[in-house]
Regions:
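Catalytic loop of the DD-peptidase/beta-lactamase superfamily, centered on the K-T-G motif
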Residues: 14-15, 19, 45, 50-186
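Active-site helix/loop module of the DD-peptidase/beta-lactamase fold
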Residues: 3-41, 45, 80-82
């Protein structure tokens, strides 16, 4: 995208996402203003890890955000806000099956697909959009249920944080089958 537009990733994110959706505390590069609210991560043993101060934007791993900001983004993702209807449909339409490169097929595979930029999962609560993040001592997960107008966002500052996801899904959305968590652990 940088090559096509001549703009940096940070500039594109600010112009197309952060400003339009009111994400005032989000950036792909470190800002000193984040110092007051940033949390240290914790490794598998529970020991604090340093906070990374990325000076260059990396789309896959350098996003700094708050739960409030990221939830605003999730609501736009869930509804397709700011997108043409045809583009918004791409966020809910399987584009490819979730194949694991070099890994054997799993029981969860038939229930997981990829749309444009987001995972799709069949759940007992309906079709869900989902994604996860893993920055070592920080783990993240989100799931939206567009049919129920609900979303769950989980940020943790622990290398063990992903162990909470299934239990939190069951508590928040209710008992049921959430194939995304099984897919992640297989």
């Amino acid at each position: 995208m940088e090559h096509l537009t001549g703009k940096s990733w940070e500039t594109l994110a600010r112009e197309e996402v952060f400003k339009p959706f009111g994400l005032k505390n989000s950036s792909f590069t470190w800002h000193e203003s984040f110092t007051a609210t940033a949390s240290a991560g914790h490794d598998e043993a529970g020991k604090p890890t340093p906070i990374d101060h990325f000076t260059e934007p990396y789309a896959g791993f350098s996003l700094y955000s708050t739960a409030t900001d990221y939830n605003r983004f999730l609501q736009a993702l869930r509804t397709g806000q700011g997108l043409k209807p045809a583009t918004a449909r791409l966020l809910h339409t399987p584009a490819t099956a979730a194949e694991r490169c070099g890994k054997a097929a799993s029981a969860a595979d038939p229930y997981i697909d990829w749309a444009c930029g987001v995972g799709l999962a069949s759940t007992s609560q309906g079709l869900a959009q989902w994604q996860w993040g893993d920055n070592g001592s920080f783990k993240g997960f989100f799931m939206t249920l567009p049919g129920r107008q609900e979303s769950l966002l989980l940020f943790t500052n622990s290398a063990n944080g992903s162990q909470l996801v299934e239990e939190v899904l069951q508590l928040f959305f209710g008992p049921g089958q959430y194939w995304a968590t099984q897919w992640l652990t297989e």
